[in-house]
Amino acid sequence: MQKRYTITPEFIKFSDINKDDFILSSSLYEKVNFKNTNGIFLKELLSCSLSNEFKGSDVGSDNYVDQSPYTFLRTKALQDFNYLPDFNKESLLRIKPSSFKEMNLKKGDLILSKDSNIGEITILDDDYPKMMISSAMYKLPIEKDKYYIFAFIKHSAFREQLDLLVPKGATIRHAKTLFLGCSIIFPKKNREKIIDYIETLVKSVIKKEKLIKIKHEKILHSIENEIASNQKDEVFTFSQPTISELKKKNRLDTNLYGSYFKEINFKIKNYKYGYSTLKELGYELSRGQNLQISNIGRSIYSKRYRSNFYELMLPKFLSKYGTVNKVEYLGNSNKLKILKKGELIFGAEGFEKGRSIVIIDEKEKVITNIHGITIRKKREQNLKQAIFIKCFLDFLRSKGVIDLFAVGGNGGSLAQKYWDEIYFPNLSEIVQDTVSNLYHNPEAHYNKEFDMATFYQIDEEFNSKAGIYELDKSMKLIKNKIDEVIDAIVQDNDPQLTFDFLKTI
């Protein structure tokens, strides 16, 4: 975590050293420096005391099962790049009904992590009567200014306070209830107006995150329905692999011979409008840039934007929705392998392989690393077709097909030799348009003047048109604006409460 408000004193009093048992570690004397002292401890903002009824409970791995309506939420669901919980096979586990503890989780509840990723927080977008949280989390009983407090806890001003309060552990850190001693800084002037502005923006982000999930599901359902409703007369029958099939794949340790894979593959090949491979569609595959010193020499890495640096879009930073959770920057004097508009990055390795993204805007210096496969059209780029390819790969990933191709340990990798066995249905232009617009709609813009009174309506109009790409882009701009306003509050400056920043979309 890059510290913005933490300072180390140039000198200390002997009495301070004596009080701390003569420990001379500089970190022990660090403190946060907020120009605005109008803060209230988090514990004073709770609607009631934080008793054990608000703390989660552990169930033990013996209670994990494959099928159950009851679920167990772990701290991995709380991520700094999301407002809503990130549900996946590692963060949300199914458990035996007998181990379930009722926690009455409701829409709008704030869930904060006290262990591991300490201080991370999420807000629930729905009621979850059959979900419980782990003992590493608390449900915060907050009613007044809930969304403002949520935004402040997400901000580095809160995290830096907590970092100084929590002992530095060797591996996992435990905050217990020390987070209650952190201050939430409030505006000195125009308090209600500023809080209303931030809460309006927070609610907009929550709406957009939810819509991204909904539109991604629509993409998957559209593809599945199109294939299922346009089958030829042939009927699938499973057969064991032949000798020639075994020789062709040269593998015995694979599920590609199983009925599950063969049935999915059959439906694609049985699509009445035909199918094609990537090569037949005019695309080629290549590995991303090798960033090792032996290949490109020394580089400078930065988490912040720097002019003339390459934008580093790594597969591990991609979400399953085709967005980027974060980027880093790399300075290097060599001419590296850049990505152009209409090209894809596909994460081919690890337990989360199969995540991908399309480069929508023309950018000067975007690169990925060798763990990513780049998919590019040999001739003129076709953005709509590239988006369909990305969305169909998402569909295969959602069905577990990408994992079935994997070779090797630690999640395995999708070797390039297997891409000739991945078939893409020849969807009509109309269907491709429908799928493509759910991911990227170039007609979605904030092209009206608006203020606090009209923002909600105009934001709703934008959201209804926007694809996943536009929702994510606007969401990131709004999050940056929220951080900018909170920073101004902490520094005791007058924040600019405008919406002009959205006109770039």
PLM ranges: what are they?
Residues 39-61, 76-107, 279-300, 314-341:
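Sequence-specific dsDNA recognition surfaces
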Residues 130-138, 168-193, 365-373, 407-434, ...:
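A short glycine-rich beta-alpha junction/loop motif
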Residues 61-70, 84-90, 102-105, 122-135, ...:
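Short, surface-exposed loop/turn microsegments at beta-strand edges and helix-strand junctions
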Residues 78, 96-99, 103, 111-121, ...:
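Well-ordered mid-protein domain cores that form the structural environment of catalytic cofactors
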Residues 1-60, 188-300, 428-505:
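Non-catalytic DNA-recognition/assembly elements of restriction-modification systems
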Residues 74, 113-153, 336, 345-392:
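A short beta-sheet element
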Residues 45, 69-74, 307-312:
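Short, contiguous, well-structured surface segments enriched in hydrophobic/aromatic residues
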